Amino acid sequence: MMRLLFVFFMVHTIFIPCFSFDTPGKDLPLTLDYYKSTCPTVFDVIKKEMECIVKEDPRNAAIIIRLHFHDCFVQGCDGSVLLDETETLQGEKKASPNINSLKGYKIVDRIKNIIESECPGVVSCADLLTIGARDATILVGGPYWDVPVGRKDSKTASYELATTNLPTPEEGLISIIAKFYSQGLSVEDMVALIGAHTIGKAQCRNFRSRIYGDFQVTSALNPVSETYLASLREICPASSGEGDSNVTAIDNVTPNLFDNSIYHTLLRGEGLLNSDQEMYTSLFGIQTRRIVSKYAEDPVAFFEQFSKSMVKMGNILNSESLADGEVRRNCRFVNT
């Protein structure tokens, strides 16, 4: 036990990052009324469009939240994830954690075009994505939180950081904790933010090793788990390359409702993604196991922490973009 505690402690001491981000907790140049005089309708416009988009397909809520997450973990929340590849810029869209999982770029384009028609050159793509993620959460039953705004869009992207900074579905707990910690996010933040998987879907390529690996061990193969596992294997064949892009809900109980069901799934040992299940069954999950149990028992506690953690993640800013950033006219390209 002492060895486990030592390893867990070392995660929090060795992996201290050296980056130029303004991490959560510092004085930040973001305010709730940043657009009060320059684009007072921006929140209403984004809300209205998100209502239509989520009504068209509830999965769009998870898509926008995921885009926001992947943006903030690379260079801070600066809209870099939205940049297309050009002759002079290598974008993040083709990085391994993004290429087969991120969508929603056309949704951002749609909202941005409307905002530009009302308030040209005022609202950043980074702010659009941050507000949209909040509204997406609410529209599928999740909590409300105030969104501070005033972010700038970066003129750069980082394929390398997208490859190294973002957690992957098959990653172990210690590595994931380190990645959140490097962004200034705590273990409590991590467990809460991963709760957004309650409305997400995953591709076969991202859960194949789990359902043909230790799923039987963690779920103890009770009759319900056996049935669930059999259905997953029908969706996702064992052979790599076969059915890789087939998808299923990460939360198979209430897949279109933002609730705490995902944590009950982990308690049963039925987590679809290894990275999720690790929070409850890993030998190093002393703290995460307790938090998962708390959120499974108390949905109010989960909602409260999720709101706080989303604000905290949204406050990860890129110092370079703050000083030399811009408001892109088209979220896919740097202004010329």
Swiss-Prot record:
The keyword Chaperone does not apply. Glycans are attached at residue 246. The active site is at residue 70. GO terms for cellular component: extracellular region. The record marks 66 as: Transition state stabilizer. It catalyses: 2 a phenolic donor + H2O2 = 2 a phenolic radical donor + 2 H2O. Disulfide bonds join 39-119, 72-77, 125-331, 204-236. Binds 1 heme b (iron(II)-protoporphyrin IX) group per subunit. Binds 2 calcium ions per subunit. Heme b binds at residue 197. One of its GO terms (molecular function) is lactoperoxidase activity. Ca(2+) 2 binds at residues 198, 251, 254, 259. Keywords: Biological rhythms, Calcium, Disulfide bond, Glycoprotein, Heme, Hydrogen peroxide, Iron, Metal-binding, Oxidoreductase, Peroxidase, Secreted, Signal. Residues 1-20 form the signal peptide. Expressed in roots and stems. It is found in: Secreted. Coiled coil: none annotated. One of its GO terms (biological process) is rhythmic process. There are 73 peroxidase genes in A.thaliana. This is Peroxidase 11. It comes from Arabidopsis thaliana.
